[in-house]
Amino acid sequence: LDDRRYMDIPGYDRMYLDDATRFIATMNHGYAGTRELNEALVSRFMVIEMPKQSEETLTKILKKDFPTADVEKLTQFIGVFLDLQEKAENGEISTKALDLRGLIAALKTIRCGLSPVKAMQMGIVNKCFDAFEKDIVQDVVNVRIPEEWTSEDIF
């Protein structure tokens, strides 16, 4: 994986790489099971720092996936994500609840008829296993997603 352009695969053979070969790896730094990379490994790669999600990006993604959603209400779901993102950046919560896939899954279940509050509990809140953290995340959801909203209000 360096300038020699080959890999030795134990028990197999030496594999020569085309000049156009690239490897892309991802790492969720700070997640359980990850640790600091050693200097020798880091020196072999370039690092792409991914920016935090913006309201504009989230709106584009969610409008594409949910074109029939009420725009004002969709903005509240985006607000939940952005509020949680800020809390995670400030160290108030872990990044477990900061889950775009969970938000999308919650919106899909709302579209199928589940209440927005229950869907957010399943898709976002219940990703936290610490009771204190779960309460914080639930409070963020409660501020933006009223209990009386139904799936028909969103879609």
Model-found features: residue ranges?
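C-terminal regulatory/interaction module of P-loop NTP-utilizing enzymes
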Residues: 1-155
